[in-house]
């Protein structure tokens, strides 16, 4: 190897090491922020939302107490009771070499939350019953399930927006 090749390899390794360190630091900071948020709001209902363009009871995130979780979900602290959740949900599934990407329009649904509990809301390709069977009951309690069906090309696609109360 000549010196130019060695210099390029060294430069790439240095850039990779710096980027890796920065990303590791950001991940640790986000994890610490999430844990602090959860601790500060343990007396509220914590809703982990895996969607975009979120509104709760007609209010945008700017008017709500929220943080970003380690999986880039939005965690919102809410009082117990009935709430209306709005958002654009997305999910992806890989079947062999084929990838299905599904995105909803703005969806709205009502959910009743209890203070002191944690919940997650996301879109899945399988119903709560199918997921519970597949994961041998190792999923939370489904408190809301909104079945969706789409016609994408010649494929018939079904999906579900499910809100789970976490174990």
Descriptions of predicted regions:
Residues 1-77, 88-167:
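Short loop/turn and low-complexity linker motifs enriched in small/turn-promoting residues
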Residues 81-86:
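A short tyrosine-centered beta-strand micro-motif
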């Amino acid at each position: 190897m000549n010196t130019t090749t060695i210099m390029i390899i060294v430069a790439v390794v240095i850039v990779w090491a710096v980027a890796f360190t920065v990303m590791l630091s950001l991940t640790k900071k986000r994890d610490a922020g999430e844990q602090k948020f959860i601790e500060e709001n343990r007396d509220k209902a914590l809703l982990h939302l895996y969607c975009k363009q979120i509104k709760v009871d007609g209010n945008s995130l700017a008017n709500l107490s929220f943080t970003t979780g380690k999986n880039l979900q939005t965690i919102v602290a809410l009082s117990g009771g009935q709430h209306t959740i709005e958002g654009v949900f997305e999910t992806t599934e890989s079947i062999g070499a084929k990838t299905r990407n599904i995105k909803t329009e703005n969806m709205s649904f009502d959910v009743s939350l209890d203070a002191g509990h944690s919940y997650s809301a996301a879109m899945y390709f399988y119903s709560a019953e199918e997921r519970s069977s597949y994961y041998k009951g190792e999923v939370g309690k489904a408190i809301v399930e909104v079945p969706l069906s789409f016609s994408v090309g010649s494929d018939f696609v079904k999906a579900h927006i499910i809100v789970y109360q976490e174990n």
